[in-house]
């Protein structure tokens, strides 16, 4: 069975993990209202998708 001959240092361990960081979601600006939204999804602010109204959004008073 394979066993490490030497202890892995903190620097070597951390260098190996340098690619493990998580990225945030890729957001795009809505062409209708300008709010940030997820791509290929209906805008939660205005309800538009691909240039037309898909969801009727209630106005907050």
Swiss-Prot record:
GO terms for molecular function: structural constituent of ribosome. PANTHER family: 50S RIBOSOMAL PROTEIN L32 (PTHR35534), LARGE RIBOSOMAL SUBUNIT PROTEIN BL32 (PTHR35534:SF1). Keywords: Ribonucleoprotein, Ribosomal protein. It comes from Rubrobacter xylanophilus (strain DSM 9941 / JCM 11954 / NBRC 16129 / PRD-1). One of its GO terms (biological process) is translation. Disulfide bonds: none annotated. Transmembrane segments: none annotated. Residues 1-24 are annotated as: Disordered. Residues 1-22 have a biased composition (Basic residues). GO terms for cellular component: large ribosomal subunit. This is Large ribosomal subunit protein bL32. Belongs to the bacterial ribosomal protein bL32 family. The gene is rpmF. InterPro entries: Ribosomal_bL32, Ribosomal_bL32_bact, Ribosomal_zn-bd.
